């Protein structure tokens, strides 16, 4: 993952300008939501290879601000475990290589890398980088299950990006799963309802970005964009 794109990871056929325009539009919606205290939902649609995942990753990568005090942290959620594994490893390797490079600040002072320099991030270990990467690329069912914990407040994430949102489970399928696998006999929501309710616990603003592939529902019980 170099230069804020994933051409080596996620095949895409869209023009770069289309992706830039789409990303800028979503960024504007996020900024308006922050400024006005709004809750917003965006739907990014397209055929396979259109660049939906790339748009979502670009936003998550720029806006994951865990531990900065900005209260904006973004999370990229996917039900595709191989994709999550590959993205985490690729991002970790890329950031690990970048941290070894001397930054402009250290060059100007004619120093070798300063272990306390935030630009170099020389002080970070590969394990620490991987932990940071895990905070903004997650399996969607882990995020969903967090919402079920007793007394669990709103998530730390103000921006949730759902990859392949058309594959979200219908109420019947998710309710049955929660009853039989999670010990939640009274659960009565679809996966979209559950995730929206979780993000709606924020008292001020929040933005949900749904990446939707039309007609790409694969298994029974997957809701499609209508849900």
Indicate where each model-derived feature is located.
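Core RecA-like ATPase module of SF1/SF2 helicases and allied nucleic-acid translocases
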Residues: 96, 104, 126-130, 136, ...
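Disulfide-bonded cysteines in secreted/extracellular proteins and peptides
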Residues: 103-106, 117-120, 153
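Charged, low-complexity interaction regions
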Residues: 110-116
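Phosphate-binding P-loop
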Residues: 28-41
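Conserved helicase motor core of SF1/SF2 NTP-dependent helicases
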Residues: 10-20, 27-30, 45-50, 54-55, ...
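A short acidic, Gly/Pro-enriched loop at the edge of an enzyme's catalytic core
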Residues: 155-157
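Short glycine-rich substrate-engagement loop in P-loop NTPases that contacts/grips substrate
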Residues: 127-150
């Amino acid at each position: 993952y170099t230069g804020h794109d994933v051409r080596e990871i996620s095949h895409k056929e869209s023009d770069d300008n289309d992706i830039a325009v789409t990303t800028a539009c979503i960024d504007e919606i996020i900024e308006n939501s922050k400024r006005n205290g709004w809750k917003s939902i965006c739907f990014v649609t397209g055929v396979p290879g259109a660049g939906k995942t790339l748009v979502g990753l670009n936003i998550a990568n720029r806006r994951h601000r865990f531990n900065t005090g900005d209260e904006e942290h973004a999370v990229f959620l996917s039900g595709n475990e191989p994709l999550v594994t590959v993205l985490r490893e690729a991002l970790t390797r890329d950031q690990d290589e970048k941290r070894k490079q001397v930054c402009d600040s250290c060059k100007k002072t004619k120093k070798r890398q300063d272990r306390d320099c935030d630009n170099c991030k020389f002080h970070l270990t590969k394990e620490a980088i991987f932990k940071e990467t895990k905070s903004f690329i997650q399996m969607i069912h882990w995020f969903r299950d967090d919402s079920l914990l007793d007394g669990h407040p709103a998530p730390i994430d103000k921006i949730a990006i759902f990859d392949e949102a058309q594959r979200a489970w219908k109420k019947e399928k998710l309710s049955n799963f929660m009853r039989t696998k999670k010990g939640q006999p009274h659960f009565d929501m679809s996966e979209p309802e559950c995730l929206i309710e979780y993000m709606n616990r924020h008292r001020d603003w929040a933005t949900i970005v749904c990446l939707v592939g039309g007609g790409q529902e694969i298994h029974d019980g997957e809701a499609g964009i209508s849900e």
